[in-house]
């Protein structure tokens, strides 16, 4: 044997040992070995179960073995020539296998263990996702419950505030009493809980609108009574001045009021201290005080009718002009001689006219159809009334009270007709001088400064 052949035998054996070591390491891996065993078992079982398939597989095995043997025989010279390169590749493959075994520990485990571990990981992941979904569902349920409770609290508090600031009317109390008489009717709180949020909110808005409308009309009627009370006292004061100007000894008014108090003070004074100038001055001071009080009432009426029809605003403007004319007539007077007779007659007519205008003002407001405050999905039961309630004025009178009976003796319609006839004909029963002075006062009557009107739905709701 030559030296070259002797040298090649050891190198060939070393390469085969290294190659065998690499192959053995790969095959010896538990995962690979278990997988190959499982595949072989399935393959053998398939061949035994199907004879035709088994014959074909055995034939294919023989062919593959023959082809592999021949290929190795022909490739042997090439493999011997590439032995150094193959050895290097084998070494690199071994290093890569070592690193792979470190990074993938499951390669050292059988396939059953790997499959079981994978199942456990998947099951734990699915369980985590399911738990997260359950927590999210539980959180959404709690959030819904919290929102529902918050809405209930807000609605209940709103209903309590409405009941406190806008008490129930007689109609609502009668309806509740009729419902309470039924054998199977629950309480008001139970009925409210059974209703939906939108229905409760719509009912609340309709109730607020109805109660606030009645409340606002009641306040307007109260202002009307206050204004008419002041006008009645002012009318008696003007009559007192007229009687004293004509030289007629006036009698004490039978009705209580500021004029009655003034006469009571005069009656309690001793005769020597009753000076006519002092009485005249106090009467004029009383007239100016009543006029200023009337101006404040008119300002309240003006703020209440902003945004209402032009007819209501015009009535208040007429009252304002009458009050301003009275204020101008009595502004500089220190005694009865400073008040012209024509101005006094004109003032009495203006007071009567203002009284009638205040009466007509409330009638216009009561007859006006109120606009709905809330429309859309949050007001499912709001329906605009085609006409106002027929007994609304009577219901308001029950709360506010009717006209003051102290001034029932004043014939306001007759005084109003006399004032209108005097202005229509241009001449009255008095002398021409009185009418001339009255005409001058009318011409010099200051105009009410115009101010921008703020239009609102229900401006009288300033409570």
UniProtKB/Swiss-Prot annotation:
Annotated stretches, region: Interaction with LIPE: 1-108
Main location per the UniProt record: other
Pfam families on file: Perilipin
Location of the region described as Essential for lipid droplet targeting in the Swiss-Prot/TrEMBL record: 1-173
Region (Interaction with PNPLA2 and ABHD5) location: 185-463
MF annotations from Gene Ontology: identical protein binding; lipase binding
Subcellular location: Lipid droplet; Cytoplasm; Mitochondrion
PTMs per UniProt: Phosphorylated by PKA. Phosphorylated on serine in skeletal muscle at rest or upon lipolytic stimulation.
Annotated positions of the Phosphoserine modification: 2, 148, 322
GO biological processes: lipid droplet organization; lipid storage; mitochondrion localization; negative regulation of fatty acid beta-oxidation; negative regulation of lipase activity; negative regulation of peroxisome proliferator activated receptor signaling pathway; negative regulation of reactive oxygen species metabolic process; negative regulation of triglyceride catabolic process
GO CC, any one term: intracellular membrane-bounded organelle
Region of interest (Recruits mitochondria at the lipid droplet surface), residue spans: 444-463
Keywords: Cytoplasm, Lipid droplet, Mitochondrion, Phosphoprotein
Description of what induces expression: Increased by endurance and sprint interval training.
Tissues/organs with expression: Expressed in skeletal muscle, liver, heart and kidney.
Subunit structure: Homooligomer. Interacts with PNPLA2; prevents interaction of PNPLA2 with ABHD5. Interacts with ABHD5; targets ABHD5 to lipid droplets and promotes interaction of ABHD5 with PNPLA2. Interacts with LIPE.
PANTHER family to which the protein is assigned, alphabetical: PERILIPIN, PERILIPIN-5
Similarity comment text for this entry: Belongs to the perilipin family.
Reported function: Lipid droplet-associated protein that maintains the balance between lipogenesis and lipolysis and also regulates fatty acid oxidation in oxidative tissues. Recruits mitochondria to the surface of lipid droplets and is involved in lipid droplet homeostasis by regulating both the storage of fatty acids in the form of triglycerides and the release of fatty acids for mitochondrial fatty acid oxidation. In lipid droplet triacylglycerol hydrolysis, plays a role as a scaffolding protein for three major key lipolytic players: ABHD5, PNPLA2 and LIPE.
Name by which UniProt lists this protein: Perilipin-5
Organism: Homo sapiens (Human)
């Amino acid at each position: 044997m030559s030296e070259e052949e002797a040298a090649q035998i050891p190198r060939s054996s070393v390469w085969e040992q290294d190659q065998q070591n690499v192959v053995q390491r790969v095959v010896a891996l538990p995962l690979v070995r278990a997988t190959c065993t499982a595949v072989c078992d399935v393959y053998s079982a398939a061949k035994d179960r199907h004879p035709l398939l088994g014959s074909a597989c055995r034939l294919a095995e023989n062919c593959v073995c023959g082809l592999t043997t021949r290929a190795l025989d022909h490739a042997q010279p090439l493999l011997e020539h590439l032995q150094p390169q193959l050895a290097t590749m084998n070494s690199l493959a071994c290093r890569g296998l070592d690193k792979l075994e470190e990074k993938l520990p499951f390669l050292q485990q059988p396939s059953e263990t790997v499959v079981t571990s994978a199942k456990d990981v998947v099951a734990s992941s699915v369980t985590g996702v399911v738990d997260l979904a359950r927590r999210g569902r539980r959180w959404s349920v709690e959030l819904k419950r919290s929102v529902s409770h918050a809405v209930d609290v807000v609605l209940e508090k709103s209903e309590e505030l409405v009941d406190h600031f806008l008490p129930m009317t007689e109609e609502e109390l009668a309806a509740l009493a009729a419902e309470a008489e039924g054998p199977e009717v629950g309480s008001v709180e139970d009925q409210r809980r059974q209703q939906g949020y939108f229905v409760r909110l719509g009912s609340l808005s309709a109730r607020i609108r109805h109660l606030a409308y009645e409340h606002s009309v009641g306040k307007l009627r109260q202002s009307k009574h206050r204004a008419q009370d002041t006008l009645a006292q002012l009318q008696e004061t003007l009559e007192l001045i007229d009687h004293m100007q004509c030289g007629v000894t006036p009698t004490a008014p039978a009705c209580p009021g500021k004029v009655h108090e003034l006469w009571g003070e005069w009656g309690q004074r001793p005769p020597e201290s009753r000076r006519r100038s002092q009485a005249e001055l106090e009467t004029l001071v009383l007239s100016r005080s009543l006029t200023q009080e009337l101006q404040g009432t008119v300002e309240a009426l003006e703020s209440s009718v902003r945004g209402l029809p032009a007819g209501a605003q015009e009535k208040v403007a007429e009252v304002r002009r009458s009050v301003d004319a009275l204020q101008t007539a009595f502004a500089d007077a220190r005694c009865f001689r400073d008040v012209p007779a024509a101005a006094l007659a004109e003032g009495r007519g203006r007071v009567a006219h203002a009284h009638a205008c205040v009466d007509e003002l409330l009638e216009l407001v009561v007859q006006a159809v109120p606009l709905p405050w809330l429309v859309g999905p949050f007001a499912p039961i709001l329906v605009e009334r085609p006409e106002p309630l027929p007994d609304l004025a009577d219901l308001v009178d029950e709360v506010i009270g009717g006209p003051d009976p102290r001034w029932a003796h004043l014939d306001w319609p007759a005084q109003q007709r006399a004032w209108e006839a005097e202005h229509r004909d241009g001449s009255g029963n008095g002398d021409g001088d009185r009418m001339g002075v009255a005409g001058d006062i009318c011409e010099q009557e200051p105009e009410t400064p115009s101010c921008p009107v703020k239009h609102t739905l229900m401006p009288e709701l300033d409570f």
